[in-house]
Amino acid sequence: MKKYITTTLLFASIFSLAQHIEIVPLGVYGGSDESNLSAYLVGEEGKNEYISMDGGTIYSGIKSAINNNTFKTDESSVLKNYIKGYFISHGHLDHLGGMIINSPEDSKKNIYGSPEMIKVLKENYFTNAAWANFGNEGETPILNKYQYNPYTDQEQFKIDGTILDAQIFELSHVNPWKSSALKVSTPTQSLIYFGDTGADRIEKSNKLNEVWKAIAPEIKSGKLKTIMLEVSFPNAQPEHLLFGHLTPKLLMEELNVLANYTGKNALKNLNVIVTHIKPKGDNPSIIKNELDSLNNLGIKFIYPQQGKRIIIN
């Protein structure tokens, strides 16, 4: 009996030490406000060891997080010490401009992404004509601050300086142009972040379908609790003018495809963090209302705010 109690307490202690994933949004919008563009710090709760999912806004987002008491240190410490690397989903400025602007003040770290995205950084941004070459390849002089780590569709790897394992997925963003998603995992929990993406039906691709098939087992087991996915426009936006983005209708269309692999019950209370809203006029409130009215799966929609921590339970 004593041995049983000791073993039970040991497992209870281990379980209590299991950490949740936390997200610190540095930027949440998909345009217009250059001080609040796509960038999310993701890491194990309480460790201050993050991968930055995209890098549209960095410094302004860190400052907002400090003002919200999310971080209790200065901006430079967060930039240099807390951010262990960047995942850049694709080569558009609203997803990487903040990283580039802050590169002179940053510390040495890795950039993870698809080979196509790494090529854009080397040939279009980290060049003498556009900025300076802070990468480890490309035009001379090579400053060697950022180490390029290209990975192909569904390849798995580790995020240096964190506990996180990762897997990259290819997306379609105005076919044939590409974007990507990244799934990150602790031993007990997973999350997947999507860069910009169109719906398979509009893009005439199967990229999202392949992601849904890949992540369905972890959703069914309860390990993957959170999807971070864009909704850029309200439903009124014509489908031929979406430019590789989603509306509430198209998001729910895709989540119902996911439900075909998981069963509808597995998606009840799944966290879907809505990213990349274009904040023109009343778009944010319209998108929220449309998602609520179309939510036939019991999804828990979360609307991130710059600088305010989200804990995934």
Predicted regions: what is each one?
Residues 1-21:
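Bacterial Sec-dependent N-terminal signal peptides
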Residues 23, 40, 54, 90, ...:
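Divalent metal-coordination and catalytic microenvironments
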Residues 26, 116-179, 296-311:
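Metallo-beta-lactamase
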Residues 32-87, 97-104, 203, 207-215:
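Pre-active-site segment of Zn-dependent metallo-hydrolases
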Residues 39, 43, 150-220:
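Catalytic core of the metallo-beta-lactamase
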Residues 52-56, 82-94, 112-114, 193-196, ...:
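Active-site neighborhood of phospho(di)ester-bond hydrolases with catalytic His/Asp-centered motifs
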Residues 74-141:
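Active-site HxH/HxHxD metal-binding segment of metal-dependent hydrolases
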Residues 200-305:
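Cap/insert and terminal regions of metallo-dependent hydrolase folds
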